[in-house]
């Protein structure tokens, strides 16, 4: 049963009264949960309550457009069952070690850029801002937003019927037409990849009163940059992207990064073919059919990166309640930045991010209807020689597939700012061009002007897949079982009597019900059917004796 899951639809005329009553009861229960959470009665996943804070977004009378940022904290949220939050307050010792690592990793062009401007990527990053009108929720405290996300997940049919309180506000956004600003945000995104030392600089900020206070590195990491300009209200969160062993030396987060990549950017749990190991059990067994309810549950699970990013944002708003927050990141970090920006209506700048429109819709993230593109607060920077950003890193022979990454999305939300390096420089599609240092040194710094940010072209991901809800799948299974029983009974009552008194033994094939395929190969051929049919009819023809009287 194929349906558009992202559009409000009316129930079919054949809906029974009991099913209608169930929908009404479910709606009332979901609304009650949503209201209770929004009133502040939520206990964050069994942990000690962290105050839900809405950053003070009142602009100063004459805000300065020039800012200078320095890293002050590094947050980490692991994705194990016993989730711990780690925060390192940056010390002078750490800055000196990070500077050395940064100079070893960044290209010479970046060295010259920083030296010529008397700036260091860890102590002084220049940014320019501008005031822009943005339409977003009036009530954006984490408790309220997360209660909505939970309600939308429990009853997605109500998503289109919810009435949101939208408000237009003037906020500070990054000036994406300024070259220094775009480069500085990219350097922040690259800093999130730098390995952090296991020293006494770390401070445990676990929300739990008791329990382990360890450091686990296989999760989400975010660097927090604070504006050093007096009176400035800005903080930037830089989220780490994918660490992939096939692209670099890898790291502690490789396994979790890969799992979240395959969950966020594949059509159905990385079910590319029967040869692939899926990251969740949402594939129904029918060709190109996936359980949408299962997917939404997996995306919002506690051990997934989107949930971890929400918790990092909650921590930062608690630490800086009077600051406005921007977010940036590269690759996976860029996609998570855009999703976080969409969730809370904050400015987000991503670099070479995979298409994140599909998970944005699956999570029912709030998006104001009918806003002009001039009010868009999410920007995606990329170039035409990056197969991940362009959405073409798929197929059996692609680098992503060889490495076990199911990168099947290409659609972005927000504005696209694309450098045409294929035409201008003669580049070819290559995974090497996806690296953040290649982007900084050979693209952002090689152009005198930033790329124009324009609305993305019409786009649709996973057009050949059929996404069904759990209830729809159950109804389809019931209909198939009814068909089986009907055809079986009709084939049994097939004996007829005539006036002839002889007995004839004939080999006849009973009319089998339509077989249900439970497993297909990579090109769609069924290789295993429903075991009920085999048990009922066997593998050979049935010999039926018909008596003619």
Curated annotation (Swiss-Prot):
Residues 474-510 are annotated as: Disordered. Disulfide bonds: none annotated. Glycans are attached at residues 204, 315, 448. Residues 487-504 have a biased composition (Low complexity). Residues 43-549 are lumenal. Its EC number is 3.1.1.3. The chain crosses the membrane at residues 20-42. It catalyses: a triacylglycerol + H2O = a diacylglycerol + a fatty acid + H(+). It holds the Pfam family Lipase_3. This is Putative lipase ATG15. It comes from Yarrowia lipolytica (strain CLIB 122 / E 150). The lineage of its organism: Eukaryota, Fungi, Dikarya, Ascomycota, Saccharomycotina.
């Amino acid at each position: 049963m194929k349906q558009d899951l992202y559009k409000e639809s009316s129930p079919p005329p054949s809906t029974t009264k009991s099913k209608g009553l169930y929908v009404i009861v479910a709606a009332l229960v979901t609304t009650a949960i949503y209201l209770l959470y929004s009133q502040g009665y939520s206990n964050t996943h069994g942990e000690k309550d962290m105050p839900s804070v809405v950053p003070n977004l009142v602009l100063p009378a004459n805000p300065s457009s020039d800012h200078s940022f320095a890293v002050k904290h590094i947050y980490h949220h692991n994705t194990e069952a016993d989730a711990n939050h780690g925060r390192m307050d940056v010390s002078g010792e750490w800055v000196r070690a990070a500077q050395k690592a940064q100079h070893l990793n960044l290209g010479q062009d970046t060295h010259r850029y920083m030296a010529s401007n008397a700036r260091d990527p860890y102590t002084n990053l220049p940014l320019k801002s501008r005031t822009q009108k943005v339409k977003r929720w009036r009530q954006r405290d984490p408790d309220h937003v997360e209660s909505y996300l939970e309600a939308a997940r429990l009853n997605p049919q109500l998503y289109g019927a919810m009435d949101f309180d939208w408000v237009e506000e003037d906020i500070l956004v990054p000036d994406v037409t300024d070259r220094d600003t775009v480069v500085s945000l990219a350097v922040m995104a690259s800093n999130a990849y730098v390995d952090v030392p296991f020293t006494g600089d770390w401070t445990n900020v676990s929300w739990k009163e008791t329990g382990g206070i360890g450091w686990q590195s296989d999760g989400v990491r975010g660097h927090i940059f604070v504006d050093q300009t007096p009176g400035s209200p800005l903080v930037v969160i830089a989220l780490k992207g994918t660490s992939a062993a096939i692209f670099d030396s890898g790291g502690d987060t490789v396994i979790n990064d890969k799992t979240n990549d395959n969950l966020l950017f594949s059509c159905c749990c990385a079910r590319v073919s029967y040869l692939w190991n899926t990251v969740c059990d949402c594939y129904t067994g029918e060709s190109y059919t996936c359980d949408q309810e299962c997917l939404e549950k997996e995306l919002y699970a506690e051990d997934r990166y989107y949930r971890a990013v929400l918790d990092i944002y909650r921590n930062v708003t608690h630490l800086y309640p009077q600051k406005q927050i921007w977010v940036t990141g590269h690759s996976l970090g860029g996609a998570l930045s855009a999703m976080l920006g969409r969730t809370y209506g904050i400015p987000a700048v991503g670099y070479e991010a995979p298409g994140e429109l599909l998970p944005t819709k699956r999570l029912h993230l709030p998006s104001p209807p009918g806003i002009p593109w001039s009010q868009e607060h999410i920007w995606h920077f990329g170039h035409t020689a990056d197969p991940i950003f362009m959405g073409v890193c798929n197929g059996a022979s692609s680098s992503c597939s060889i490495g076990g990454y199911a990168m099947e999305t290409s659609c972005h939300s927000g504005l696209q700012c694309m450098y045409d390096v294929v035409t201008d420089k003669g580049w070819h599609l290559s995974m090497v061009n996806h690296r953040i240092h290649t982007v900084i040194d050979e693209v952002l710094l090689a152009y005198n002007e930033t790329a124009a940010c324009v609305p993305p072209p019409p786009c649709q991901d996973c057009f050949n897949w059929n996404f069904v809800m759990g209830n729809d799948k159950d109804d389809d299974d019931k209909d198939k079982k009814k068909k089986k029983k009907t055809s079986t009974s009709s084939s049994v009552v097939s004996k007829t009597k005539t006036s002839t008194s002889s007995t004839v033994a004939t080999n006849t094939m009973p009319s089998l019900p339509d077989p249900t395929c439970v497993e297909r190969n990579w090109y769609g051929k069924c290789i295993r059917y429903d075991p009920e049919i085999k048990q009922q009819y066997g593998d050979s023809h049935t010999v039926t004796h018909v008596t003619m009287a």
